[in-house]
Amino acid sequence: MVEINGKEYGLFYSVRAHCEYDDYVCEHPNVSVTRAIIQKALIMSKAYCDIHGGTPLKSADIMNLPNSEYMKLMKAVVEQEAKDSGIEIETEPTEKNAVSREL
């Protein structure tokens, strides 16, 4: 779960969600890393809601976030995928590795 602007959203990494994400990236070879992560956030949010109910994230929800909330969501997506894949990562954002929202 990640809290964005006071509302909690669940993220669930599944093989199905991963396949949908991979299909999206394969179909769009010019996709930016930022857009790919946003797409993954939307798919993971939908996968969570399919299992647990609730309202999934929408792209407008993400694009209207303040930078701090946006970075929190991106971090949650990466951490959830890594956790469910059994990978240990370091995800503390810094100025050096910050990602722009420009698509």
In which residue ranges do the predicted regions lie?
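Short, surface-exposed, charged amphipathic helix/loop patches that serve as local interaction elements
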Residues: 12-103
